[in-house]
Amino acid sequence: MKVELVFIPSPGVGHIRATTALAKLLVASDNRLSVTLIVIPSRVSDDASSSVYTNSEDRLRYILLPARDQTTDLVSYIDSQKPQVRAVVSKVAGDVSTRSDSRLAGIVVDMFCTSMIDIADEFNLSAYIFYTSNASYLGLQFHVQSLYDEKELDVSEFKDTEMKFDVPTLTQPFPAKCLPSVMLNKKWFPYVLGRARSFRATKGILVNSVADMEPQALSFFSGGNGNTNIPPVYAVGPIMDLESSGDEEKRKEILHWLKEQPTKSVVFLCFGSMGGFSEEQAREIAVALERSGHRFLWSLRRASPVGNKSNPPPGEFTNLEEILPKGFLDRTVEIGKIISWAPQVDVLNSPAIGAFVTHCGWNSILESLWFGVPMAAWPIYAEQQFNAFHMVDELGLAAEVKKEYRRDFLVEEPEIVTADEIERGIKCAMEQDSKMRKRVMEMKDKLHVALVDGGSSNCALKKFVQDVVDNVP
């Protein structure tokens, strides 16, 4: 019997790339499987994401939905797509029903698209989650929901406290100041609870992580700590799109510059597709870079206004000489390069890169570890504060810039991270013979081994496919 899955990624380049990479892995792992990937258009113009789904392939096809009103918040925007998604699923189900040897086996929805689970129920299909973050954070979501539903404990009341609490998927006490903004906000907290409850109602959760990277979390999910009412969790990572994309001329120029730099001599600063800073913060970064004495490749963009629910992407600074310290560009011309867009995978793969100052998006963390590059953690939004704690305190794979920093639509006025804090994080991450660098190299090996035939993630992927077949109604 042949089976087909429908994938629904969240809009945005990171989620679409990860979902596409997972879909490709699945169809390559089993000839019985086909995937239809329904692409919800990004709320912002994003050429990088459109390049992912330009061509359908054998047993993998893309259906791009027409754009809708893009001025609302992400949750409302995704919900507005349900009628279009329902129509596509109906057509796919109809097409599959005409083939006697095929069955529509289920829908795999992104962790932010849980409202689409209703569509699976309407068509009597199994629903699965693709959790594009880590297993430890998934455990935090379940734990926060359990605290509220079973003990009437609301973690949003921990805002602005120094409180720490135990999370079953972590070995270290977790500081409330590193909770994501949505968990600390009374308005958004019910949404957090609803998502966790929705996760429990599915047949399984695919997590973009590796068993050897998060043994505490995977032990918890396997039932080792008596947890109940959680579906099977499959650690199938690292799921990454390592293909080059974007402006080819800029890419060549950047890589040519890197080739001229000594091995492990360059600190790379890049903060994701939505990462930008104010003029004042950019000046602090510049001061820190110059003081550190290290060569640098800095992806610098201007932050969008705070408090905007539509969350527009960062823009460009029109005149760097006006916003950076006087003479900075002249003094660092031989050791530094400032860019707007960065071919991140290619840069991290360069022998010249010694450390990565990152916003701690999960894709960026996995890419950094895949190439064996130590990190300096500077989170900005979403679950990145948790990820920073996870990398710095739990696993010792990153130095800290400021792990509780945040700049998102719920923050009225972001604080300024000082040059001293930035310099300290850079110097620590760039240290050549550190224990942290050794741990990063060990983790690199674990990530690579997980994907080979017989590796933990390879086995988890095969187990998922078999469970999908077994769950066909």
UniProtKB/Swiss-Prot annotation:
Belongs to the UDP-glycosyltransferase family. It catalyses: a flavonol + UDP-alpha-D-glucose = a flavonol 3-O-beta-D-glucoside + UDP + H(+). Possesses quercetin 3-O-glucosyltransferase activity in vitro. Also active in vitro on benzoates and benzoate derivatives. It is an enzyme of class 2 (transferase). It comes from Arabidopsis thaliana. The keyword Transferase applies. The active site is at H15 (proton acceptor), D110 (charge relay). The gene is UGT71B1. This is UDP-glycosyltransferase 71B1. UDP-alpha-D-glucose binds at T132, A342, Q344, H359, W362, N363, S364, E367, E383, Q384. The keyword tRNA processing does not apply. It comes from the Eukaryota.
